């Protein structure tokens, strides 16, 4: 699964891009001073200069964002600041002012004089900043922490995967470790404001976050960050052993004096707020909760469809797919026996799966030539923190390496591994990312987070992956087994997406959620409780995947109806990939545009 920084399954909630007021004043003073003078500069030139300046300012606002976006920022004319994680703002006034200034400037361009590609970029930027501003007074409902997707859970992974391209990266990494404590202090200030406003997390969620933190700091001398740092230093290969040893000691000391104490301080600060979170149900029970949920859906899924319409579409999809699955099983009752016993899959290694997928997808998707990938196994010390597989997005200035990590702890094999590698690799995240990077689109588009498109695409390709996998299923009913396996996954994702809306928008209690799940054979109280709690803690997360998938599916159906016999599936996929990650209204607008 792909994020703005990397395709990790452990992900933070997106927060608005924040730039200092000083930079904004400098930018807009530059505009009025004639930086974008009309003398000899076309409207396209002015817009590209503006979006380029915005990119430079925003990408340099965070060391992590800069590093994961550009391996060598100096070559792009971007000077690195002192490494820092920054702070979490407790007042969004400046952020909204910036969004308004951006909106005003974007609306000032002569739209008709822009190229189609620049019009698309402008549309996406305008919608992005308008959506961020719509958060309004509900910003305290944002939650940077979480047991699985919170920043305190993701940060160690982001730091562990911090690549060393040059010696400066090593010193920046070590400096970042010293900024965790002030960063966490800013989070605690934010959490205190949430508590005062009545928006603090429930004690159940607090316990789960504290357990995650405890797990990370429990054995500091055997932390996976120590092992990974040593491995990266060795692979960097440009430092003498004496200097490496000195860096290893320095790193170990920073872990004990900075990182571990920062987590301990965070835990102590959160514990002091225990009991102040009174709501144990969905967002709708908070003041402004429904409006905040609408913001989440728009910003995370990239869709602006009304919630009730989403609910109806999901219900129809769930009903349709249950009906299809029932028909298949009635016609092939032996499939149930095979499924309960386990599908027999031909022995094939992960690299062979990815190589085979590159060939098989060419029936339905445009070919992607001259692309390389690396398969890596998740380090033993990181197994419990990472998902079964993930794609690590390369910096935009290098385009490499394209790395897919496999976590042996998940023990994915056969059909499950094949389709997971398709989701992360071909024609999923890796394929979509490389295709878009080769378009050489405006740099700013790499920062406009469009999770709904990215995860929607990687889910949209899964039914094709199950279809390709049928060639490796050792059973006379291979095609039917592959189809019913996809339907099972789709039904589950649809079911959880519906629950997300019911819990956070319509206010379902755990008892109501349990009644719904019982209809699908899920009755174990512990399982029901875990599903309910996970959705409480990650509002909108399932919808990024499944509503994104349905949005692409419905767009394809619309194009089929519009073009009739002239519809070409591969051409449709090519156009979607060419447009790249945008909000769905923008995708729909440009689906038949010429670039």
Label each PLM-derived region with a short phrase:
Residues 5-595:
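N-terminal maturation segment of proteins
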């Amino acid at each position: 699964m792909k994020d703005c920084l990397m395709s990790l399954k452990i992900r933070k909630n997106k927060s608005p891009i924040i730039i200092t007021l000083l930079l904004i004043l400098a930018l807009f003073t530059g505009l009025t001073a004639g930086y974008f003078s009309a003398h000899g500069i076309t409207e396209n030139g002015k817009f590209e200069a503006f979006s380029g300046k915005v990119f430079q300012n925003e990408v340099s606002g965070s060391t992590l964002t800069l590093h994961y976006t550009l391996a060598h920022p100096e070559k792009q004319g971007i000077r690195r600041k002192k490494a820092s994680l920054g702070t979490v703002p407790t007042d969004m006034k400046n952020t909204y002012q910036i969004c308004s200034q951006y909106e005003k400037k974007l609306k000032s361009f002569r739209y008709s004089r822009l190229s189609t590609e620049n019009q698309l970029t402008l549309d996406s930027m305008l919608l992005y900043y308008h959506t961020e501003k719509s958060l309004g007074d509900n910003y305290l409902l944002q939650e940077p922490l979480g047991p699985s997707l919170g920043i305190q859970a993701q940060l160690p992974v982001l730091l562990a995967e911090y690549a060393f391209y040059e010696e400066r990266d090593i010193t920046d990494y070590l400096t970042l470790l010293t900024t965790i404590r002030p960063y966490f202090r800013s989070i605690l200030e934010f959490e205190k404001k949430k508590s005062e406003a009545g928006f603090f997390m429930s004690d159940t969620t607090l316990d789960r976050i504290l357990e995650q933190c405890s797990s990370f700091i429990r054995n500091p001398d055997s932390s996976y960050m120590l092992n990974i740092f040593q491995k990266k230093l060795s692979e960097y290969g440009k430092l003498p052993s004496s200097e490496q040893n000195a860096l290893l000691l320095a790193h170990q000391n920073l872990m004990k004096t900075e990182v571990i104490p920062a987590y301990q301080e965070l835990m102590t600060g959160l514990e002091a707020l225990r009991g102040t979170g009174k709501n144990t149900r969905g967002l709708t029970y908070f003041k402004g909760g429904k409006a905040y949920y609408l913001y989440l859906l728009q910003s995370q899924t990239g869709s602006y469809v009304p919630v009730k319409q989403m609910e109806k579409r999901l219900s129809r999809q769930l009903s349709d797919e249950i009906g299809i699955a029932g028909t298949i099983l009635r016609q092939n009752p032996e499939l149930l026996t095979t499924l309960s016993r386990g599908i027999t899959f031909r022995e094939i290694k992960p690299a062979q799966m990815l190589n085979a997928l590159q060939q098989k997808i060419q029936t339905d998707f445009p070919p992607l030539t001259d692309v390389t990938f690396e398969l890596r196994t998740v380090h033993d010390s990181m197994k419990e923190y990472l998902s079964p597989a993930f794609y690590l997005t390369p910096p935009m200035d290098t385009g490499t390496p394209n790395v897919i990590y496999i976590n042996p702890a998940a023990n994915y094999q056969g059909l499950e591994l094949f389709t997971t590698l398709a989701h992360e690799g071909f024609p999923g995240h890796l394929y979509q990312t490389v295709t878009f990077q080769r378009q050489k689109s405006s740099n700013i588009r790499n920062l406009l987070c469009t999770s709904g498109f990215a995860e929607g695409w990687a889910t949209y390709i899964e039914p094709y992956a199950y279809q390709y996998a049928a060639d490796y299923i050792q059973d006379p009913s291979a095609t039917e087994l592959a189809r019913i396996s996809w339907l099972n996954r789709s039904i589950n994702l649809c079911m959880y997406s519906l629950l997300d809306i019911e819990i956070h928008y319509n206010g379902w209690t755990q008892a109501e959620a349990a009644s719904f799940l019982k209809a699908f054979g899920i009755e174990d109280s512990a399982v029901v409780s875990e599903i309910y709690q996970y959705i409480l803690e990650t509002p909108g997360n399932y919808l990024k995947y499944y509503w994104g998938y349905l949005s692409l599916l419905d767009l394809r159906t619309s194009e089929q109806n519009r073009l009739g016999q002239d519809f070409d599936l591969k051409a449709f996929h090519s156009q979607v990939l060419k447009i790249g990650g945008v909000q769905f209204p923008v995708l729909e607008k440009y689906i038949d545009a010429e670039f």
